[in-house]
């Protein structure tokens, strides 16, 4: 019989900082006339023949139902008065570095999750504060006063809960989840709010009767693992407030990937799938060279307007063969809302999740 040890480290003090509508907020800051207006970071569909994808948008735009990864045309249809801005990634990167410098006043134990969010372990910190809430408030204050931007903060004893907390109250929110509050907090949370649960997984969980964290808390972890592989076990742990992944200041290499840029744009889905086969073969060769297998496949697609889509898929088995990787990458491609009119200038396939094989063995 499989055994699942439940080891929960509640001694850490973790903060997750998520910049509020980051790209749009930077544009509003730099152009105050945009304040209070629906701002969409995407090329204007009236100037591109309806092409383009939304990177992000202001909260005023979100009130109309606009969201990231939506087509610019659909965003325009929802809100014709929206102000479309192509965006300036170089500027956003510069501001992101300024935010990180503020983090460094309090701790060097910082893990950047993306350009607009990061985890901070402040268990030991530079100002000798016992309260992580105090540090989170200071960071919010510094970012607002010095950079003219707001962020939401989540505080808890692990990264998963800190991320959940930062999403709980936006914008400019601050939420604390204490160890003795975690189970009750998670029990009420819909499974789609669990970080890492993708759109494809939600209906599968619903079909099995799992709608909330409380449902997962009452589940048989062995049954979840049989249905979802190691991911099912991780879901059970998260629903019970357990996530012992440490904040990593310098991330070790945990993935193998290859990208191709095309001088001649790709339009036809069949052409894109054919290229994914070629790229998957290169990834497979690299994996085998390093004697690695992974259960997470990531597809990266960049349109001609430089809008980039990234989508991942968790597999039950560890993969390293070109056929399996290509099949998974093609499945992901079929799941995205591909805009054939834009043309693709870059494709990438990445495999990660190398620790899964060991974790599976540990449960036997």
Curated annotation (Swiss-Prot):
PROSITE patterns: UMUC (PS50173). The gene is dinB. Residues 14-198 form the UmuC domain. Its EC number is 2.7.7.7. Belongs to the DNA polymerase type-Y family. Disulfide bonds: none annotated. The active site is at 117. It comes from Lactococcus lactis subsp. cremoris (strain SK11). This is DNA polymerase IV. Its cofactor is Mg(2+).
